[in-house]
A protein has these predicted regions:
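Membrane-proximal N-terminal soluble sensing/regulatory segments of transmembrane proteins
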Residues: 62-139, 268-358
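N-terminal membrane-insertion alpha helix
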Residues: 49-69, 251-271
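Extracellular/periplasmic juxtamembrane segments that couple receptor/chemosensory ectodomains to their
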Residues: 276, 281, 392-420
Length: 463
């Protein structure tokens, strides 16, 4: 009798599938598709956050560089330059009017030199661009010591021959100190121009990826919503609806503030700062020219040196308004463009009260130049004492009075633009101040809504 052995079934072996094939099979199932959509949407949300943050950083850095780093340094450099030029003019007037040691010119000179020293110490402690700023500051500090020594020597000899020391001090001021002040201004101005130009050229390109990231996330959320509606017979998934709504709100928020920040930046730079820069350069140049007028009279009797001072004076005044001042005043009243710092300002009128202040500046400048012509006519006519009295006088109709009127009007024009600049920069920072928090909250809510919204649908396929 034979026994029959039962047949042993062979185990079924699963084919070795590649990762790609496994994913392909998973995506053919509803749970697999939902898991993929969830992962893709979360990744897109994180990508959107990163791209939006990059756009934010680019915009904020531009506002920071222009509003807090370069412009204040440029203005500080121009203030130093203007104060130095005025201190130099006061030193000359001290000798020209033969004032007492406690006279107004010497007191103003000492006050301004102390102010410059304090400002340079502050500038040395706030260097942003390395040797580009450090070297001019060092030069000014070193050369100012030599300048004050020469002025002190001239003062000690002012009852005798003080001209050689005063001339040496004047040359040092113009060739070394004021040149270094201009270099400090230029270092920051070049960085401002480069930053602003690069930002304006690239801003749209840097915002575009964030927009693309938002669109990608929206498409993924919408397609997942559509897939669920088709497969689960549910019209809307609450979690995905919330995620989509939050994304739209965040996008609208970004779209609303980014152009406003950019507009504030443009207004601050092109409308306010460009005028501020022109006006500060006008002030510094005018102070320098005013010193030339005093040197012209100080060299009374020396026709050769007086001719040199006259040329220097007109070279500088032309920088403020190229051409006859009375004709330029008519041009300004008619709204016609003319060259010079004051012409640049009058061509860039933007803010309330700015035109009136700028026109008053132009009128005061024309008045000052008319009085200068009277001084030179009196000197040429042999009326030195009358010319001197007109130069150093402070009563209405005198040169110093007219110059003070000009500087006061220029200061008011500066104040209008400085106030506008400060407001625009503050507004830009205020708009950006909550963006990062809003972005973080947006991403957290979107990811949470995606996970919570899809989880119940995945749970339906578990058994």
């Amino acid at each position: 009798m034979s026994s029959t052995q039962p047949a042993v079934a062979k185990p079924v072996t699963q084919p070795n599938l590649s990762l790609q094939e496994k994913w392909s099979q998973q995506l053919k199932t509803v749970p697999g598709r939902l898991k993929f959509s969830r992962a893709a949407a979360i990744a897109a949300a994180l990508l959107f956050a990163v791209l939006a943050y990059v756009s934010y950083i680019d915009l904020r850095e531009a506002v920071q560089t222009i509003g807090r780093d370069t412009v204040p340094s440029i203005i500080a450099a121009e203030k130093v330059r203007a104060t130095l030029a005025d201190a130099n003019a006061n030193a000359v007037n001290f000798f020209l009017a033969n004032e007492a040691d406690d006279g107004p010119s010497w007191s103003a000179y000492r006050r301004e030199m102390d102010e410059v020293q304090d400002n340079l110490i502050v500038a040395a402690q706030n260097i942003t661009y390395g040797d580009e700023e450090r070297q001019p500051i060092r030069t000014m500090m070193m050369q100012l010591a030599a300048y004050e020594r020469l002025i002190g020597q001239a003062r000690a000899h002012r009852q005798g021959d003080f001209h050689s020391d005063l001339d040496a001090a004047e040359q040092l001021m113009r060739d070394k100190i004021l040149t270094a002040a201009s270099a400090l201004d230029k270092a920051n101005f070049d960085h401002l121009t480069a930053t602003y130009t690069a930002h304006r050229a690239s801003f749209s390109g840097k915002v575009a990826p964030a927009i693309a990231g938002g669109v990608l996330l929206f498409v993924l959320l919408f397609s997942t919503q559509l897939f669920l509606a088709q497969r689960t017979r549910r019209t809307l998934n609450p979690g995905l609806v919330i995620a989509t709504a939050v994304l739209i709100v965040c996008a609208l928020y970004a779209v609303s503030i980014f152009p406003k920040v950019e507009n504030s930046l443009v207004t601050a730079k092109e409308d306010a700062f460009d005028s501020i820069h022109a006006l500060w350069r006008a002030r510094a140049t005018a102070f320098d020219a005013n010193a030339d007028e005093s040197f012209y009279l100080l060299d009374h009797g020396n026709d050769g040196k007086q001719a040199v001072w006259t040329k220097k004076f007109y070279d500088k005044t032309t920088l403020l308004s190229a051409g006859d001042p009375d004709r330029m005043l008519v041009y300004a009243q008619q709204g016609k463009r003319f060259n010079g710092y004051l012409g640049d300002e009058l061509a860039n009128i933007t803010f309330p009260g700015e035109k009136e202040a700028a026109m008053q500046t132009m009128r005061a400048w024309a008045c000052y130049l008319d009085i200068d012509q009277q001084i030179r006519h009196l000197e040429a006519s042999g009326k030195y004492k009358e010319a001197l009295a007109l130069n150093v006088g402070t009563q209405p109709g005198d040169s110093n009075w007219a110059f003070a009127q000009f500087d006061d009007a220029l200061g008011k024009t500066l104040d209008v633009n400085q106030h506008a600049f400060d407001n625009e920069i503050a507004h830009a920072f205020d708009l950006l101040s909550h963006f990062v928090y809003a972005l973080i909250a947006t991403v957290v809510v979107i990811i949470a809504a995606i996970v919570i919204g899809i989880k119940p649908r995945l749970d339906e396929y578990r058994f």
